[in-house]
């Protein structure tokens, strides 16, 4: 684990289109947008000849990706981009929303199953491995019924300050993983506020 490969690609998951902008399910897009903005990067089509759309931006030597194929098909464009740039699954860091985590909580993992997330499941199926690092961003627990409506809803006004600070911490976690390695980022950002106190 200490010798985890250098991260070369960071992919934020979400749904394209203005109707999905700023929804809970699109927190992955929000995080990579913030990271791209910090580096003054602009989004452009990543692999012109690819059949599946994705937008890309540069963050130093790291490629940022937003799959434009809708969440449940995220694996197709991401796999095409990784093949084009010869990037291994262990060199990719996925950012996704997580219903099981409280709003504001981050959880970095080097591997694992999809945990009920269709976007991550699509990626695992396309790459044929669960050895893909991921940063799960808590969006709060949905009501027992209607979780689809919940993940496609926008954050409440009273949640927005916490959402902004969470996006900032997620960007810091990504930069730490890129600069210092995945293990260092996990040790720093997987702690809860009570553990840090």
Model feature map: region roles:
Residues 1-111, 121-135, 142-146, 161-196:
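Nucleotide and nucleotide-moiety/phosphate-recognizing core
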Residues 107-113, 152-155:
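Short glycine-enriched, charge-decorated loop/helix-capping segments at active-site entrances
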């Amino acid at each position: 684990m200490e010798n985890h490969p250098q991260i070369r690609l960071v992919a934020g998951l979400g749904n394209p289109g203005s109707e999905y902008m700023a929804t809970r399910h699109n927190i992955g897009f929000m995080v990579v947008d913030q990271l791209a903005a910090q580096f003054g990067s602009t989004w452009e089509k990543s692999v012109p000849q690819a059949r599946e759309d994705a937008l890309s931006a540069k963050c130093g030597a790291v490629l940022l990706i937003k799959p434009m194929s809708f969440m449940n098909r995220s694996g197709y464009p991401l796999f095409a981009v990784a093949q084009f740039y010869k990037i291994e699954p262990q060199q990719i860091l996925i950012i996704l929303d997580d219903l099981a985590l409280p709003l504001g909580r981050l959880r970095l993992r080097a591997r694992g199953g999809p945990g009920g997330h269709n976007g991550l499941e699509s990626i695992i199926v396309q790459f044929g491995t669960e050895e893909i690092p991921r940063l799960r961003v808590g969006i709060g627990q949905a009501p027992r019924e209607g979780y689809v409506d919940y993940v496609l809803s926008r954050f409440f006004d009273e949640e927005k300050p916490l959402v902004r600070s969470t996006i900032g911490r997620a960007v810091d976690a990504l930069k730490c993983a890129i600069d210092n390695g995945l293990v260092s980022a996990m040790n720093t950002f997987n702690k809860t506020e009570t553990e840090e106190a």
